Amino acid sequence: MEERSSRCLEVGAGAKRGQGEWITIDMNDACDIYWDLRKGIPFPDRSLNKIYSSHFLEHLTFNEARGFLEECKRVLVPDGKFLICVPNARIYLEAYVKGEPLDANRFFGWAPAYNHTTKIDMVNYTAYMDGTHKYMFDEENLLFILGANGFRNPRLRNHDPELDLQERAYESIYAEADR
């Protein structure tokens, strides 16, 4: 029987340090491991039980995201869990199409748009975050991308207050899948 690791990895964690079983990785000196995840995940095959990604995948191009998801599968143990949340493009696009005001306090409470002179400027800011966002997601394409990259049983999940940031709850899609 294969020995299962007790390690869990949070990718794109920013300045956050891991606690308990969690290890953090990002291009930030304050996290546990400083690493560019576009170059792979520096762990052996089948060495992690869980990977958690919060508002990271949208910072990769489509092809970079495919490579990243392949790496996640590689380092997860069989039946390991991949948990993810990404910005929900639908809320911004629906507000735009319906002509609803894109209130900076509602849509950008954590960082006001630097240029919100028109509604489409606010949508563009959300989509590209001054050039740091490379891809937009809705529920359908997030689940499709997980399945297309070989994850089993991709499904939506609820916001988990022990894992997910409360300030991201309104704007996020939450999903999980099995290796």
Predicted regions mapped to residue ranges:
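Conserved alpha-helix/loop element of class I SAM-dependent methyltransferases that forms part
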Residues: 1-5
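S-adenosyl-L-methionine-dependent methyltransferase catalytic module, highlighting the catalytic core
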Residues: 64-71, 77, 81-178
